[in-house]
Amino acid sequence: MDIRYIKADPSGNTTIFVLSQTVPARRSALAAKLLRPDCIGAEQVGYLTMAQDKPIRVDMMGGEFCGNASRSAAAYALLCSGKTEGDYAVSCSGCDHVLQAHAVQREKNKYDAYIEMPLPLAVEAILMDVGGMPSRFFRVSLPGIVHFVHFIDDTALADREVFWQAVQDYAAEEALEAYGLILFSPRQLQMIPAVYVTATDTLYWENSCGSGSVAVAAALACMGKKDVSCTIHQPGGTIDIMAHVEDGQLRRIVIGGPVLFGKEQQITLA
């Protein structure tokens, strides 16, 4: 089987975009092969469909939603167009909304891409047992994924495995398509993201996370009841977040940042 693909790097969250037509039922198994370091290697796989006069379609490997892949899809559409700037509509698995994105070429194979994200279905403060101690988390339910955001003072001092075990134990009681842990330091403006996708049974401590950045923006905006605008430093790069609050309600969230592309290639799989 010959697979055409291109590798995107949105702020370090390496993503394989499969450009060939594939059978949906085989996508999880195909993604598992492509993700192996001895094959292509990346943090995630998305299946890209582009048709004239229709939104760009991104189907993630486990049917989850991904903000970084969605904005990268807009950047790829701009790359294909040969233009230097453009607005695009993007549809992604795990999300019922068509998302509006804007992409700008900075240099060859390097773009900035921003996308208006779906608003959380719910944001609530919860207590979770972490190593025998109660800790406050913000549970941010987004289309296709639930993030558990915990504020810390210093990301370098956090025992991420202990926090992940707490989230995993908590989430085991629910049938979630995908869920994540976001350790965020408001002082440092740094975050450590982890995402688990149930369909593919994959856990990644990601280099950056778009939906996790949305979760941080939502938690900050709902906690402070005011607009949020900052750049979050992630293990593999930076993501800009902007949240607008009106009459005490969260009305809009936008994320963005750099996207790099490799060359379009083809691989033959047995």
Q: Which residues are covered by each model-predicted region?
A:
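A glycine-rich beta-to-alpha transition motif near the start of alpha/beta enzyme domains, typified by
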Residues: 1-111, 141, 146-270
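Membrane helix-loop-helix hairpins that form the core translocation module of multi-pass transporters
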Residues: 112-120
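Active-site glycine-rich loop that binds ribose-phosphate moieties when present
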Residues: 119-138, 158-167
